[in-house]
Amino acid sequence: MFSALKKLVGSEQAPGRDRNIPAGLQSMNQALQRRFAKGVQYNMKIVIRGDRNTGKTALWHRLQGKKFVEEYIPTQEIQVTSIHWSYKTTDDVVKVEVWDVVDKGKCKKRGDGLKMENDPQEAESEMALDAEFLDVYKNCNGVVMMFDITKQWTFNYILRELPKVPTHVPVCVLGNYRDMGEHRVILPDDVRDVLDHLDRPPGSSYFRYAESSMKNSFGLKYLHRFFNIPFLQLQRETLLRQLETNQLDIDATLEELSVQQETEDQNYDIFLEMMEARSRGHASPLTTSGQSPSSGSQSPVVPPSTVSTGSSSPSTPQPVLQPPLQAPPAPPAPAEAPPLPAAPPRRSIIARLFGSTPATEAAPPPPEPTPAAEASQKVQNVEDFVPEDSLDGSFLEDTVPAKDEKRLGARGPQDSDSDRETQAGNPMVAGFQDDVDLEDKPPSRPLPPTGPVPSEDITLSSEEEAEEGAGHPKAAVLAPQKCPEPETRRSSTKALGPPRDAAPRAAKPRPEGPSGKLEEGTDKPVSSESDAEGPIAAQMLSFVMDDPDFESDSDAQRRAGEFPVREDLSDLTDEDAGPVQPPAPPKPLAPSFRLKDDSDLFGLGLEEPGREDSSEQDKEGRPPAKEKKKKKKKGREEEDKAAKKRSKHKKSRERADDKGRDERRRRPRGPQRTALDELEAFLGGGAPSGPLRGGGDYEAL
């Protein structure tokens, strides 16, 4: 049990280790192992030579720090060990090997049993590690020659061996047994004279003489200091080799420089070409990578636009996305836009006057699918360059100019790329708009609303009464809002309150850009609501007011004094026709409102209300009339801006209009009532006759 523990601890391994080490070798001290483990900069070899019994082994032990042993035990083989030594002014780790050299070794065979007989041949046959076997001066840095000052033959050995030492190796002649100086035979002066008269070539290394005593460690310090000479020589040789290597490196570098001077690397023109090629190589991936994030950012922008379509009317989402697409690539487009939006409204007004409202309403939806295909083709073919990159900035913009909206509404196939994309994302919008168009198409639509719409019709038809009674207070409220609007709209807004039907319309198209398009750019919602509410005469008036050209004509007529009432009614119908929502559910009392409108349109009660309205306008709207003349000179851009602001303020006008309608109901006019009664009797019979008369009236105008 205890033996096993000892084996684990390793206490019994030390003696075994000594047994395994061959003769003449020993294990290195642990301290030296740790020191040399860090790295050795210099390896220095010191050789101790001398005749027998001169104290070589004693010196070898003393250098290791061991005690002096008085008994003489002849050394059989060369012994080598490492000692602690370092140069005083350097931190370099120096490994000093000390060799105890035996000139003639004797190898004794150690047997396990008793020696039975002498065998001299066997002893001679075995080889020993001695000076005869190997060259002890090879790679030697210093030599220590020892002799006994009490024995002359030991000094003769020194005289024989000194010539064999290489000339570059320093030698220290050490006279041992100084403790027995009373028996000395060799004097120090004799030794110095011999060393001085040795025949050595010039440049040979140094010879030094000293005396020592291994018994009391005398002369060891001197010997330690003597080791500085072989170390410094070794360091010098090392540095010289480094200097040679350094010089060789310098020469090689000079050759490389001379060769490189002739290569293409030193040609400036070639260098510039390489730089240009690198710049082009770096620029091409940057452009592709710059486009990829834009296309990636496009995906999140489209869904929010579809969400906004749900909140607004079906036609509103399309123009919101279109203007930004046109603005960045083609800035001159806005200048060319004004003539384009004017043409579609004229065609729609004429068509509606002649009773072709369903056709006009149905016409716009079909061309929209074709742009969708074009947009999809564009996106598929050009994947890297997406023109929709501008949507990122446009989606965050607050408003869209009314001019752009009109222009975009007029150019369905050209600029409807983004619109088609948004509808492709939200197909419910297109379906809902188709339903509205289908409801607008049937011409017999005014017949069912005759019963339900009277509430709306009464409020809308009594605009003339509102001009007299409630026109003044409303004008004070609405005038500041409509200041930048065109002349015709400003006079109408001051004289007349906005219709109540505009309230639902303004609620949805609250975004300013879409609302502007709802009023002027898109005629579909206007026609749909007018058809649902009553006869086509109201539609005709609404579209007449929508057309900016017609407004200018009505202004000229208003100067004559014949058609101020008609213009006011057209303004009021225009406001009524604005809503984008699908047709409201039928309500009773529709014929009363439409009869009043028809009477105004067809001239049954036209003269008296016209005079009263003109007188009221003279009282209330004199300054606006002058402003109208001045503002007529301004371009259509101002009208578009006014239309845009009109959409913003519709809520306030709707509220004021509700009050005006109540007052109109309370105090109707006698002369108008008679004419309106006749119109009710006439229009109650059939709606188709209304549009014909309305068309004739429009031609007379």
UniProtKB/Swiss-Prot annotation:
Phosphothreonine found at: T573
UniProt biased composition (Basic residues): 643-653
Region (Small GTPase-like): 39-279
Region annotation (Interaction with CDKN2A) ranges: 629-667
Phosphoserine PTM sites in chain numbering: S394, S416, S418, S461, S462, S552, S570, S614, S615
UniProt biased composition (Basic and acidic residues): 555-569, 608-626, 654-665
Compositionally biased residues, Low complexity: 284-315, 495-506
InterPro entries the record matches: P-loop_NTPase (IPR027417), RABL6 (IPR040385)
Binding, GTP: 50-57, 100-104, 177-179
Ranges of compositional bias, category Gly residues: 683-701
Entry superkingdom: Eukaryota
Gene Ontology molecular function terms on file: GTP binding
One cellular-component annotation, GO: cytosol
Location(s), subcellular: Nucleus; Cytoplasm
Modified residues (N-acetylmethionine): M1
PROSITE patterns assigned: RAB
Start and end residues of each stretch annotated as Disordered: 279-701
Compositional bias per record (Pro residues), positions renumbered to this chain: 316-344, 580-589
Keywords: Acetylation, Cytoplasm, GTP-binding, Nucleotide-binding, Nucleus, Phosphoprotein
Family in the record: Belongs to the small GTPase superfamily. Rab family.
Function comment: May enhance cellular proliferation. May reduce growth inhibitory activity of CDKN2A.
Name this polypeptide is given: Rab-like protein 6
Organism: Bos taurus
